[in-house]
A protein has these predicted regions:
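Loop-to-helix element that buttresses phosphate recognition and phosphoryl-transfer chemistry
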Residues: 3-5, 10-64, 138-146
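Alpha-helix-centered segments that form part of catalytic cores
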Residues: 108-149, 153
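General small-molecule cofactor/ligand-binding pocket signal
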Residues: 5, 73-75, 213
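Active-site metal-binding loops of divalent metal-dependent hydrolases
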Residues: 10, 170-171, 216
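Phosphate-coordination/substrate-recognition cap region in phosphate-metabolizing enzymes
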Residues: 35-120
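Short, well-ordered beta-to-alpha junction loops that form the rim of enzyme active sites
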Residues: 51-52, 77, 164-171
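Acidic, low-complexity terminal tails and accessory targeting/binding regions
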Residues: 81-105, 109, 141, 156-163, ...
Length: 248
């Protein structure tokens, strides 16, 4: 049975002038992930990435450890959710509800933990059925449709029995998981924040996986040798790539 492997990019350069690139730790995470796949003999028949630099660089570093690395296809539908666009559009509404929210946004520009709280509030408002139409940024429904389309196209392009590497971001993975599991909108962020850099979420390419359960969520690679028979979706990360839980 073929699978899609959704791999979050390595740590980006939070706080630098060029956020959309891997930090030294992010580069190491990607290199170790590539070595992990090589060590367990998992060879990809195709590779797809969003068009963000941190996603593409992660893919390049992972794939260089493959004996016959596939060419990386670019699909912008796998890009991260537009956090900045959502913040700009939703900030006035959220500040009306909470006078301290604007200050939290200001502090969050230089404090990754505070920024994560801003992302949580904005993301939760964005996926809510009550979210108004936002100028300049996609709606939750449109973004999710794009993610679904990208994954379905990847499945259609995969050769029989061939596994696919998909290099993407935490919000994209959370969206995919919410689609597969059919979770409520107020539960979606719970699948966003825990996604480690270079963690790996596996989706079996069968219709049944759309309503299956999530297991071994963000577990270390040692659990990979104990695959539950009923598992259709699982997430793990290479043990050696552990680092601080990042927000980038």
């Amino acid at each position: 049975m073929a699978s899609l492997y959704l791999i979050r990019h390595g740590q980006a350069s939070f706080g630098s002038d060029h956020y959309d690139q891997l930090s030294p730790l992010g580069q190491r995470q990607a290199d170790l992930s590539g070595q992990f796949f090589a060590d367990i003999g998992l060879h990809f028949g195709q590779a797809v990435s969003g068009d963000l630099s941190r996603q593409r660089e992660t893919g390049e570093r992972v794939l260089k450890a493959q004996p016959r690395p596939p060419e990386q296809r670019i699909d912008p539908r796998l890009n991260e959710v537009d956090n900045e666009g959502q913040i700009a559009a939703l900030l006035p509404m959220l500040c009306e509800r909470d006078a301290g929210f604007a200050e939290q946004v200001k502090v969050g520009r230089h404090d990754s933990k505070q920024y994560q709280k801003v992302i949580q509030a904005v993301f939760s408002a964005w996926v809510s059925p009550d979210c108004p139409e936002l100028p300049g940024t996609a709606s939750w429904c449109d973004y999710l449709d794009g993610v679904k389309g990208a994954l379905e196209d990847a499945m259609d392009c995969a050769e029989s029995g061939s596994d696919t590497a998909i290099f993407t971001s935490g919000g994209t993975i959370a969206s995919a998981v919410s689609w597969v599991l059919g979770v409520r909108h107020d539960q979606i962020y719970g699948f966003y924040e825990p996604v480690f850099n270079c963690s790996i979420t596996r989706r079996n390419t069968t219709t049944a996986c759309r309503r299956s359960t999530s297991t071994t969520w963000n577990r270390r690679s040692r659990s990979w040798t104990r695959r539950p028979r009923s598992t259709r979706l699982s997430s793990f990360r290479p043990r050696a790539a552990r680092g601080p839980t990042p927000t980038t």
